[in-house]
Amino acid sequence: MVVSNGVATKGVLEAQGVNVYYGSHLAVKDCNISIPERRVVAFIGPSGCGKSTLLRCFNRMNDLVSIARVEGRITYHGSDIYAPSVDPVGLRCSIGMVFQKANPFPKSIYENIAWGAKLNNFQGDMDELVETSLRRAALWDEVKDKLKASGFSLSGGQQQRLCIARAIAVQPEVILMDEPCSALDPISTLKIEGLMHELKEQFTIVIVTHNMQQASRVSDYTAFFNVESVDRGAKVGSLVEYGPTEEIFQNPLKESTRDYVSGRFG
């Protein structure tokens, strides 16, 4: 449950008692978090704290890692996404993902957007879908006259927005972003941040970022993860504190959160 203005609401995505293992190594322990609808939620914390690992559980990308194992319960609109009846590919149509490094397909700009829609048997006007998706990603004006050009011909920032447009085109409800600006210049980063403000009117966004200033600028809620050493030097990540971004940055409840957001470690 998420509490906003004193009112509790059920999250679009919820993790309950989630543990994530890679082989015998516990990477994330006992995570409980609720992601509210049409908000931006930022995951922050030092390297190795499990924020990207948990993010990838939300659309079962960790299924692609043979030694990964998830315990506990993760629900999407109340339904267990790890239930045997759930098709991971179909789930990823509803819960899209944008990765740290832009990864356009080796196709034209147009086909980068249209490809996923075709695979999902889109029956509408493809030209309209491509234009709408590119407009939502704030890229249309820059590429409208070269839609047949390769996606690789774009700058790094444009490629990342192309990947966002590609995710939008399959009409998800949730967009997961794993450090989408880490390889971008400041101007491209600001464009992506502005885009997130616009996209949350229609989409729920969860972003992993090492940039605390970015988290404070773009998110409505912030989750702070930390890492601790356990037996024989192994490290495990966990969720320390979660709440409205203003509270996390200005009046955190936990000392470790205060130390991290003030730059004392990380």
From Swiss-Prot:
GO CC terms in record: plasma membrane
MF annotations from Gene Ontology: ATP binding; ATP hydrolysis activity; ATPase-coupled phosphate ion transmembrane transporter activity
Domain named ABC transporter: residues: 13-252
Membrane topology: Peripheral membrane protein
Main location: membrane
Residues the record lists as binding ATP: 45-52
Localisation per UniProt entry: Cell inner membrane
EC code(s) of this entry: 7.3.2.1
Chain's role: Part of the ABC transporter complex PstSACB involved in phosphate import. Responsible for energy coupling to the transport system.
Protein name per the record: Phosphate import ATP-binding protein PstB 2
